[in-house]
Every structure is written in structure tokens, then in C-alpha cells.
């Protein structure tokens, strides 16, 4: 099965294509592109001596609008500015980004558990580096070096470890000196550790408090609290 196309049909198809191209260029208001730069072929039919039909094509350039109209150009500029404004107002850019925090604060606070552990380690290091005082206590068991570090609630057990009986602990007059106390609190989302000295004759309380000397023999300042502000 074969198809034959006459010269008239070919010319009609070419003219129809040219009209479509011109109409598209006028609607878009764009200059002629490289893909549309092909010149339309205008066919002219000539009669040869041999009675045959010859087709000669004369290229003619396509006349595209040299520039867009003022209204079309202003419309394009408004659309472009509108897109830029929308991009600037949007929280998420339409362009791919890596390593950019779109919302939230720039810095992240450490978790309370990590902060608490770090403060505890610092307090332990300070306690180990603080100088200890050697005080001699004379009783029926003889002379001993007292290098105890006071801890809340452990004073009675330390006395037992040195050989004191329960009655001796109750009747013994405390040695005039200071004891170091600590308080751990949670303030404004952070763990804070406070430390201070209290006279040993003052009672030990469950709440943090600064006590005064009751025996009149405890020093006002010791080696531990001399560095306190």
C-alpha cells in the first residue's frame, strides 16, 4: 500500500506550518529561537522542456517580532518580582539546601543530665584538690590524726570509725573548726552547686543554711572558706 502526496498538498502543509509558527511567536512575544530559525520554503512550480514538473524552493526568512510589546514586558517583570517576593517570604526555599537550619535557635543547650554530670565531676575534682588539715584528737584511744572531710549525714559514722562509742560521741565537745557544706539546686533550667563553711558546733540541718558559732571558739575564717567570695 503506497501513499502519494501531490505538490499542492505539500505547499499547503508548509504554509499551515508557517502560520502556526507566526501565531505562536506573536502569542509568546519571544524572539525567534534557534529551533525556529529554519526559513520557510516557498515552492514554485516550473515546467521543464521534458514536460516534467520541477519544484524549486526559494528560502525566505521568517519575520519574528524584534521586541516584545511594552505591556507584555511589564507583565513579565511583575510576574518575576512576584515570584521573588514569594521566595523571600517562604520559610522553605524552593532551591535545595544542605546544612541549613530553617527554624529554631542557632545554639542548642546541653541536656540537664549532661550539665549535672559535668558539675558533679567538677565538684569532686575541687574536693580532691582542696588542702586537708591534720588535727590531733586525744582520747582514751591515744593520739590520732583527723583528716576527715565532712559529709552531710555521715559525721556519726566517721566518729565510730575512729573508735568512739555512742556515748562518747554525744558527750564529746566538738572541736572548734569549720565544716564544708554543699547544696545542689535546679535554677532556670540549670544545675547549680553552692558551697560554704559552717562552724562544727552548729547543728546539721537538712536544708541549706548558714549557721553561727554557738560555742564561741570556732574561727571566723578557715583555709576552706578564705577563698569564698
From Swiss-Prot:
Taxonomic superkingdom: Viruses
Record's keyword annotation contains Aminoacyl-tRNA synthetase: no
Protein family per UniProt: Belongs to the paramyxoviruses V protein family.
Pfam families per record: zf-Paramyx-P
Cited function: Blocks host interferon signaling.
Chain intervals for the UniProt region annotation (Disordered): 30-112
Organism, as annotated: Human parainfluenza 4a virus (strain Toshiba) (HPIV-4a)
Keywords (A to Z) from UniProt: Host-virus interaction, Inhibition of host innate immune response by virus, Inhibition of host interferon signaling pathway by virus, Inhibition of host MDA5 by virus, Inhibition of host RLR pathway by virus, Inhibition of host STAT1 by virus, Interferon antiviral system evasion, Metal-binding, Viral immunoevasion, Zinc
Biased composition (Polar residues): 30-46, 82-112
Name of the molecule in the record: Non-structural protein V
Coiled coil regions, renumbered to chain: none
Positions annotated to bind Zn(2+) 1: 178, 197, 222, 225
UniProt binding sites for Zn(2+) 2: 201, 213, 215, 218
GO molecular function annotations of the record: metal ion binding
One of the GO BP terms on file: symbiont-mediated suppression of host cytoplasmic pattern recognition receptor signaling pathway via inhibition of MDA-5 activity
Amino acid at each position: 500500500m503506497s501513499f502519494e502526496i501531490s505538490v499542492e498538498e505539500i505547499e499547503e502543509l508548509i504554509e499551515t506550518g508557517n502560520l502556526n509558527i507566526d501565531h505562536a511567536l506573536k502569542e509568546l512575544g519571544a524572539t525567534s529561537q534557534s529551533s525556529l530559525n529554519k526559513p520557510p520554503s516557498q515552492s514554485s512550480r516550473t515546467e521543464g522542456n521534458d514536460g516534467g514538473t520541477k519544484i524549486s524552493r526559494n528560502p525566505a526568512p521568517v519575520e519574528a517580532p524584534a521586541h516584545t510589546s511594552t505591556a507584555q514586558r511589564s507583565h513579565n517583570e511583575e510576574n518575576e518580582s512576584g515570584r521573588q517576593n514569594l521566595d523571600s517570604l517562604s520559610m522553605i526555599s524552593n532551591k535545595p539546601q544542605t546544612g541549613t537550619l530553617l527554624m529554631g535557635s542557632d545554639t542548642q543547650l546541653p541536656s540537664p543530665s549532661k550539665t549535672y554530670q559535668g558539675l558533679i565531676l567538677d565538684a569532686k575534682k575541687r574536693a580532691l584538690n582542696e588542702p586537708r588539715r591534720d588535727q590531733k584528737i586525744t582520747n582514751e584511744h591515744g593520739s590520732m590524726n583527723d583528716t576527715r572531710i565532712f559529709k552531710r549525714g555521715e559525721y556519726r559514722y566517721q566518729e565510730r570509725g575512729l573508735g568512739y562509742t555512742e556515748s562518747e560521741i554525744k558527750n564529746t565537745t566538738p572541736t572548734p573548726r569549720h565544716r564544708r557544706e554543699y547544696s545542689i539546686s535546679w535554677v532556670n533550667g540549670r544545675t547549680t552547686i553552692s558551697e560554704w563553711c559552717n562552724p562544727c558546733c552548729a547543728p546539721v540541718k537538712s536544708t541549706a543554711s548558714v549557721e553561727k558559732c554557738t560555742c564561741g571558739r570556732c574561727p571566723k575564717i578557715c583555709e576552706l572558706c578564705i577563698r569564698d567570695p
